[in-house]
Amino acid sequence: DFGAHAEVLARRFPPGDHPDAEAWAEATRSHQAQLLRTQIELLRRLKYRPSGGFALDRLLDGAPAVSGAVFDHLRCPKPARAAVAGACAATLVVAWPPPSLHGGRGERQTWVSVVHDGREPLDPARVTAELVVAGVTRHWAWEGRVEADSVIDVGGITCPVGSSTAEATLS
C-alpha cells in the first residue's frame, strides 16, 4: 500500500502513459507542485475573502507513500515544497487564469495582479510579463504604487492562439 491517493493518481495519470515508474512519479509530483501553487496564488489574490489563508492536508509522510505531503518520509522536500514557498512570498505577481487553463482556439486572456503582504508600500513598483505562445514572444510592463497589505490588478494580457494545443509560457 502506497497511500490513500494512489488510486486517484493512477486514474488521473495512468502509469501506462509513462515509460517507467520514475517518469510517472515525476509527472505526478510536477502536477502536485503546479496544482498547489495555482490554488495558493488564487487564495492569496482573494486576500481576506473568504477566510484569509489555506491549509495543507499533510506536511510530511510518516512512511513511503503516494500522498499530498510536501516532504517525503525521509523529510526530503518534494517539488511541491518549493512551489508552496514561492506562492507564499511576501510579494507575488499572479496571472489569473493561468495560461495553462486555456483550452481552446481564439484569444488567450489573463489578468495580472500583485499581492503584497508587506507593511510598507512598494513605490515605485514595476511588473513585467513575457508570454511565449508557439514560439512567438510578447512583452508587457506596468508601473505604479502598490499599497501595504493589498492586492492590486495591474493589467491584462491578451494574445491570439491559433491552435488548441499551442504551449504557453508566462513569466
PLM ranges: what are they?
Residues V114-H116, V151-D153, T158-S171:
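Terminal connector regions
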Residues T128, H139, G156-T158:
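Short, charged/polar low-complexity linear motifs in solvent-exposed/disordered segments
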Residues G144-I152:
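Short proline/glycine- and polar residue-rich coil/turn motifs
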Residues D1-P124, L131-V132, R138-W140, V146:
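Substrate-binding clefts and catalytic carboxylate motifs of secreted carbohydrate-active enzymes
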Residues Q109, R126, T165-T169:
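Short, conserved beta-strand segments of beta-strand-rich sandwich/propeller modules, principally
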